[in-house]
């Protein structure tokens, strides 16, 4: 398998601002459905189709957390030789990069994004999703999250193929 093969997911992204934490990032795509990942609490802004589903203030729902972890683990367990990429819009990426809270564990992730993009000359709308998988997961949740992760990768390959 070509080591540079990629699973590409094209989305219409929007940002869900976090309160005292990293931001939610909400993506909507053909193969993933609507997913949110991030921590903290916030209210949704963006297309009305997503507002209707995510417009809320308060903690992330269990469903959002599960889908968030499926993205993390989907990247971690991506088939050998593949790299997962998410293409989205400038506003989402820029806001994610600016949402750095030193007292939050996610703050250093935002800083790594800045450095990675600077080092590789990546355009703002291009984000490599594998850098979302930095956290360890509670052991009792691995099985379900991993199942969702593998399913996500299978669907990405099925729906989009490789590029």
Across the structure, where does each feature detected by a protein language model lie?
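Conserved phosphate-coordination/catalytic loops
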Residues: 60-66, 107, 143
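RNase H-like nuclease fold core
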Residues: 1-65, 77
């Amino acid at each position: 398998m070509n080591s540079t093969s990629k699973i590409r997911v094209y989305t219409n992204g929007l940002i869900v601002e976090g309160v005292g934490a990293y931001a939610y990032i909400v993506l909507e795509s053909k193969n993933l459905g609507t997913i949110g990942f991030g921590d903290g609490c916030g209210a949704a802004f963006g297309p009305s189709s997503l507002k209707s589903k995510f417009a809320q203030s308060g903690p992330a729902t269990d469903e959002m957390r599960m889908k968030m972890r499926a993205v993390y683990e989907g990247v971690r367990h991506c088939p050998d030789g593949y790299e997962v990429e998410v293409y989205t819009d400038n506003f989402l990426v820029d806001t994610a990069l600016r949402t750095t809270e030193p007292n939050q564990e996610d703050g250093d992730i935002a800083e790594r994004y800045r450095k990675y993009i600077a080092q590789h000359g990546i355009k703002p709308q291009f984000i490599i999703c594998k850098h979302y998988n930095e956290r360890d997961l509670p052991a009792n949740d691995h099985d379900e999250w991993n199942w969702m992760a593998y399913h996500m990768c299978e669907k990405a390959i099925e729906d989009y193929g490789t590029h």
